[in-house]
Regions:
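ATP-grasp fold ATP-binding core
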Residues: 1, 5-12, 28-60, 83-99, ...
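Conserved divalent-metal-coordinating catalytic cores
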Residues: 1-2, 11-20, 47-50, 67-73, ...
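Glycine-/small-residue-rich beta-strand-loop submotif within the FAD-binding core of flavoenzymes
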Residues: 56-59, 65, 71
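Catalytic core of tubulin tyrosine ligase-like
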Residues: 77
Length: 217
């Protein structure tokens, strides 16, 4: 396998209102260390625009504290409401918080302006994923999709290899991928198809890729 997907748990806003206790118990039993509570909304990235950072993500949440966890989840849900994105099918994602991050960012498998075959990598080297979740990455590099592996800068070889695997597994070469790089792994946070029709498939795609990667282990 070329990348790692952090353990993932998710639910809709509607289901949270109905089954809050069940989800708190499931999260407490699923995660042993600090987590990040993330948004996954119909209002997030598409081929026409990026909404990265529009909705809240909460870092350093203790999964064993019902009070802290409930507050973090509600803050994410409130961020939907504050932007008038009130669809009850909006989701909340719970993931392990990645440690020892060297750099993190967002990669587009095509240029948004002209659909050109370049990997566009927007990244930060602060050592935190906070810039990604807030949509504040400030460095950009473009790498031609068909660049030979030995010609790719060493800093990006593992990431590009992981992205090519994801493209192959999904059968989709128009993707928006949130990632982090640690000394050991390429971590994939979210995968969104770059299409105006399929805006909210991030958790479905990421589960599909995760299952495929596990089968190849």
């Amino acid at each position: 396998k070329k990348s790692k997907i952090e353990k993932l748990y998710y639910f809709t806003v509607e289901d949270w209102k109905i089954n809050r206790g069940k989800h708190l118990n499931n999260i407490r039993n699923t995660f042993s260390s600090n987590i990040i509570v993330r948004s996954s909304s119909f209002g997030e990235d598409s081929v026409d625009k990026s909404e990265a950072g529009k909705f809240l993500s909460v870092l350093n949440v203790n999964p064993k504290s019902n009070t802290e966890l409930s507050r973090a989840i509600q803050r994410v849900i409130n961020s939907y409401n504050s932007h008038s994105v009130l669809d009850s099918k909006n989701q909340v994602l719970i993931q392990n918080q990645t440690k020892n991050v060297i750099l993190s960012g967002v990669l587009f498998t095509k240029t948004l302006e002209s659909d050109s075959p370049y990997y566009v990598i927007n990244f930060e080297t602060s050592g935190s994923t906070d810039s990604v979740t807030k949509g504040k990455v400030s460095n950009t590099i473009k790498i031609f999709n068909n660049t030979k592996q030995n010609q790719i800068p060493s800093k990006w070889k593992k990431l590009i290899s992981a992205v090519k695997e994801i493209e192959r597994l999904t059968g989709n070469d128009s993707l928006d991928i949130e990632f982090a790089i640690t000394p050991i792994d390429v971590i994939i946070f979210q995968i969104r198809p770059l299409t105006t029709v399929r805006k909210n498939l991030s958790k479905d795609v990421i589960k599909f890729v995760g299952n495929k990667i596990k089968k190849n282990e």
